[in-house]
């Protein structure tokens, strides 16, 4: 009998507890039923790049054309940033050039419908700096001639960036003729260098 009384008290207590909850104003938390996916706003695939001649000046020839025609490279500013840049090659070629434009490397170069990245052999996610050559001096020690061999180099397209191997690289495309890059230029050759 004692067990029956205890069971009845327990049942009454539970029923009373349930009745008291009805009067409370607290509601269950509101749970959102749909998932919202937002795109990541930061660029996780950005390729580190630099303006030529600012952070690094000495470069080792890494392509066959650079080893045979130009040799290693030293790049330096003549004055403040935005002014002329001197490209001094170990094989006796010296070029002074004035930057005149910065374009995305994936834009058209005017060479057979190719982008600057394709012409230079660079990364399409970086910029290409376009230079107008002011002076080109070719020493007699430069057996192959200048960057455009016997023709005068008129324009350069340059990119400095970190490649897939994690190395800083410097890529140059040399153009002869009157047409600027982007307007039917005559591509002479492309040269590749790695940081020393």
Give the residues covered by each predicted segment.
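Central antiparallel beta-sheet cores of small beta-barrel/beta-sandwich binding domains
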Residues: 82-123
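Short, solvent-exposed loop/hinge segments that bridge or flank secondary-structure elements
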Residues: 61-94, 113, 140-151
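Sec-dependent bacterial lipoprotein signal peptides
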Residues: 1-17
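Short, solvent-exposed coil/turn segments at beta-strand boundaries
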Residues: 53-56, 74-84, 160-169, 196
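Bacterial signal peptide processing site
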Residues: 19-22
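Tryptophan-anchored aromatic micro-motifs
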Residues: 43-67
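Beta-strand-rich cores of mature extracytoplasmic or soluble domains
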Residues: 119-196
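N-terminal low-complexity, Pro/Thr-rich disordered segments
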Residues: 26-45
């Amino acid at each position: 009998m004692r067990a029956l009384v205890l069971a009845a008290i327990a049942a009454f207590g539970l029923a009373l507890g349930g009745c008291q909850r009805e009067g409370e104003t607290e509601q269950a938390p509101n749970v959102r039923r749909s998932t919202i996916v937002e795109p990541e706003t930061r660029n996780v695939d950005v390729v580190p790049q630099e303006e030529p001649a600012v952070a690094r000046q000495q470069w080792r020839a890494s392509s066959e054309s650079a080893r045979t025609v130009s040799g290693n490279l030293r790049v330096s500013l003549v004055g403040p940033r935005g002014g002329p840049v001197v490209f001094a090659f170990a094989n006796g070629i010296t070029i002074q050039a004035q930057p005149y434009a910065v374009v995305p490397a994936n834009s058209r170069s005017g060479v057979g419908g190719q982008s600057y990245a394709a012409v230079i052999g660079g990364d399409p996610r970086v910029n290409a700096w376009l230079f107008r050559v002011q002076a080109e001096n070719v020493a007699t020690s430069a057996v192959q001639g200048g960057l455009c061999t016997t023709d005068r180099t008129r324009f350069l397209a340059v990119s400095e960036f970190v490649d897939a191997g994690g190395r800083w690289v410097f890529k140059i495309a040399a153009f002869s003729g009157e047409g600027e890059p982007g307007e039917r230029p005559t591509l002479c050759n492309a040269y590749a260098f790695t940081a020393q």
